[in-house]
Amino acid sequence: MVIKLEFEFLLLLPLLIIVGFIVGILGSLFGIGGGFLVAPILTFIFDYFGIPDGVKFAVGTSLFVVFINSIISIFRHAKIKNINWKASITIGIISLVFSYFSGFLVVNFIDSAILKKLFGIFLIANAIYMAKSHHIDKISDREDKLEPFILCGVITGFLSGLFGIGGGIVIIPILAMAKYPVKRAVAISVGVIPLTSIGGLISYLTANTEGYIYNIGYVSIPIALIMAIPIIYSSKLGIKINQKISPKHLRIMLSSILGVMGLFMLL
């Protein structure tokens, strides 16, 4: 991808680093990949520089960052034995297939402007649900069942490839509806995101984008790496916060972030 190293772009470098740092914290804290934050900000950057198909580049690059973040987050959570591997693998395999399918649709058929608005509506709807779901704060535990995992895998995978997210912000509300406590949902979500994100990422990496440099398909390698480096360091902080924060505060924080980013995408 051609992005001239103008003064304006140099000013954006600190923003990319800061966002990467925040995404690393959020990834470990909520069991999410951070795509809901990365994709909107990259959409703004690519639109600002007049990059054709900016939303598709934002989604593809976001999935790459999400994948890196999720791998780091898995190692962090595995150390404290906070991953439900059985549930994660079940949801992850199903979501991988559907994320590849929806990623293929975006790359080949869906208009970028429509995609941006759909993403904003999706984030706001999730924010409203999480804000109103007081009941999940009091749930202590429940037995694993296959049905919610299958539903979760289908919906998560499809939306992941569509919007460039890892799926954590989809998994947690769906599991909350199935009466899983927030922290249990986080433990499941952490193991799902690498599989979900790689499914959609393949479609964007293999897309034909002739005429650009420094990219593979719809993935901007320089920007992805700039954002990924601080994630390595900040993800550890997210784990510490996760162990200390209450389910109620965890839910409220996630709802607030989703709402703000959703409005940002609709403006």
From Swiss-Prot:
Main location: membrane
Keyword Signal among record annotations: no
Statement: the UniProt record of this protein carries the keyword Lipid metabolism: no
Cellular compartment(s): Cell membrane
Transmembrane portions of the chain: 10-30, 31-51, 55-75, 87-107, 158-178, 185-205, 213-233
GO cellular component: plasma membrane
Keywords: Cell membrane, Membrane, Transmembrane, Transmembrane helix, Transport
Xref: InterPro entries: TM_pro_TauE-like, TSUP/Inactive_protease-like
Pfam hit, one: TauE
Bilayer topology annotation: Multi-pass membrane protein
Family according to the record: Belongs to the 4-toluene sulfonate uptake permease (TSUP) (TC 2.A.102) family.
Name of the protein described by the UniProt record: Probable membrane transporter protein MJ0441
Organism: Methanocaldococcus jannaschii (strain ATCC 43067 / DSM 2661 / JAL-1 / JCM 10045 / NBRC 100440) (Methanococcus jannaschii)
